UniProtKB/Swiss-Prot annotation:
Role noted for this protein: Catalyzes the oxidative deamination of D-amino acids with broad substrate specificity.
Chief localisation class: cytoplasm
Residues bound to FAD: G14, V15, I16, D36, S44, A48, A49, I50, V157, R274, G299, G300, G302, T304
Subcellular location: Cytoplasm; Secreted, Cell wall
Binding positions for D-serine per the UniProt entry: Y219, R274, G300
Disulfide linkage: none
Name of this protein: D-amino-acid oxidase
InterPro entries: DAO, FAD-dep_OxRdtase
Taxonomic placement: Bacteria, Bacillati, Actinomycetota, Actinomycetes, Micrococcales
Biological process, per Gene Ontology: D-amino acid catabolic process
Named cofactor requirement(s): FAD
């Protein structure tokens, strides 16, 4: 328990907001999660989701977030109700020069042999990483946050001043709206992602990713009952509508990489806007009606970075505990 529990409002109930709320409530703070989207509507629900630093910055600070998150997901995978499974798969490079820095964080990675690679692939690496079924995981995580005593308040926060008097600290995990709410950051932009969800009637378990594919990013992520097939990564594209031709292209690329996908039933087409920024913003921000911790700009790696981010948010809150609201 902190020496001076704070009243903390977390803005955002995606995977970053819920993870932060979990760590803050577990530390004994009085937490309220302010949200304007149901779990099924938020971009986190569109995530594949695989532990992989996709569109994430390459820095020592980010590496720590990655490692801390990986350790937590591995721990949680021991509990089936979380929706997390550790699965082996292949990260493929069709072009040379791919960033392999993430492999130093994952135990047991190994170089793929030429026989393992799809046609035209330059190289590949085998790894066992967490695969998260988000429809299960987000519900489980919200339930845990509620069990820890946090409250949830639906509504849109348009100005941080709205929260003065009702909170000692704000955690801003609002994704694309993060910079807008702070008013000092116009560097946040969307990276549009479109995916197709297939029925996993063939009980596939091995994942495959190629974020360096010449014809477009491709990934096949088998989960417990479905397979997420992607995708797109179009920067500054605000279109939230499904583009039918894009889905056709996604499935054609994926079938070349994993022929077993042929004939599987299409369950759903989904679009999400990843909240990107050149660097993750994870810091105490002064100069507002009350203290703010910014936690946004995770790009396509929100799930991958979520627990490390949450732990850092809790550390920053502990540093602020006992300080009066400005």
């Amino acid at each position: 328990m902190p020496t001076a529990p704070l009243r903390i409002t977390v803005i955002g109930s995606g995977v970053i907001g819920l993870s932060a709320a979990h760590e803050l409530a577990a530390a004994g703070h009085q937490v309220t999660v302010a949200y304007d989207q149901e779990l099924a509507e938020c971009v986190s629900s569109v995530a594949a989701a695989i532990w992989f630093p996709y569109h994430s910055e390459n820095s020592p600070a980010a590496d720590k977030l990655l490692a801390d998150s990986l350790a937590r997901f591995e721990q949680l995978s021991e509990h089936p109700e979380t929706g997390i499974d550790l699965r082996r798969g292949l990260n493929v490079d069709h072009l040379p020069g791919a960033d392999r820095s993430w492999t130093r964080i994952v135990a047991g990675t190994e170089e793929a042999s030429p026989a393992d690679l799809p046609d035209g692939a330059h190289a590949g690496v085998w790894a066992t990483v967490p695969i998260i079924t988000m429809s299960t995981y987000l519900g489980w995580l919200r339930g845990r946050v509620e069990e820890l005593g946090a409250d949830f308040a639906k509504g849109t926060v348009t100005d941080l001043a709205q929260l003065k008097g009702g909170a000692d600290l704000v955690v801003l995990a609002a994704g694309l709206r993060g910079g807008e709410l702070l008013g000092d950051d116009d560097t946040v932009y969307p990276i549009r992602g479109q995916v197709v969800r297939l029925a996993n009637t063939k009980n596939l378990t091995q994942w495959l990713c190629d974020d360096n594919y010449p014809d477009g990013v491709s990934y096949i992520i088998p989960r417990r009952e479905d397979i997420i097939v992607g995708g797109t990564d179009t920067a500054n594209d605000w279109n939230r509508e499904v583009e039918p031709q894009t889905s056709i292209d996604i499935l054609e690329r994926a079938a070349k990489l994993v022929p077993e996908l042929e004939g599987l039933e299409v369950l759903e087409h989904k679009v999400g806007l990843r909240p990107a920024r050149e660097t993750i913003r994870l810091e105490h921000v002064a100069g507002h009606p009350l203290p703010v911790i910014a936690a946004y700009g995770h790009g396509g790696a929100g799930v991958t970075l979520s627990w490390g981010t949450a732990q850092r948010v809790a550390e920053l809150a502990a540093q602020l505990a006992g300080e009066p609201a400005s």
